[in-house]
Amino acid sequence: MLDLYDAEVRIDNQSNSDVYQRHLGVLADAADVKVSREINGDYTLDFKYPSGTELFERIAVNCIVKCEGQLFRIMRISYESAQMAQISCLHVFNCDAKRFHVPNIGSTDTSDTIGVSPYSVINSAFEGTPFTVLSYEKVQQLGMKWVGATDGFLIDFESVDKTTPYDVMMQVIENCGRGEIYVNNTEIALVERLGT
């Protein structure tokens, strides 16, 4: 089942529940629903929807679609015919983490960026965004381990500015040479391996 929400969605991470501005309806007529996820890559939702329905008039780029408990942002609406539209969505992490700009990570004091944990770099990058970086304990409760949690693995991370949290996450993965992105709506972590 797919639910449609307006473009502004707030997540209440404290109570671990979704708080929506406005539910626009259930997309009961959705067809050919396909969710795809690449490790450390795009997490997408694609579906077809008849254009002659009342709810179709409310579907717009940037609206949120909830599928399988995950939130996806509509990125593109194209038409296969006059009666059928193809809707393409990106997970809110893949989309929204690229919209925020990190003013600066680190400083001229290299103790902020040399020999630091992947967690501390990622936590700094996502500070002030709607995303919550999960703690070591929370990730362990999910049956996974943060990169560097058990072996004390540290990285050197060059001070960067004018970047996005998403780009920082990708750079940390490259610097570590390992890790997989765990994402549950706006909760994120860099784990050794997804699953248990």
Regions found by a protein language model. Give the residues of each.
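Juxtamembrane "anchor/assembly" segments of surface/extracellular structural proteins
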Residues: 1-58, 90-96, 106-116
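Short, solvent-exposed secondary-structure boundary motifs
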Residues: 17-28, 62-68, 166-174
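Catalytic micro-motifs at enzyme active sites that drive phosphoryl/nucleotidyl and oxygen chemistry
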Residues: 34, 74-78, 157
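Residues at beta-strand starts and edge strands
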Residues: 41-45, 83-85, 186
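Extracellular structured ligand-interaction cores
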Residues: 44, 69-71, 178
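Short beta-strand and beta-hairpin "edge-sheet" elements
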Residues: 63-90, 94, 182-184
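Charged- and aromatic-enriched interaction segments used to assemble
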Residues: 84, 92-196
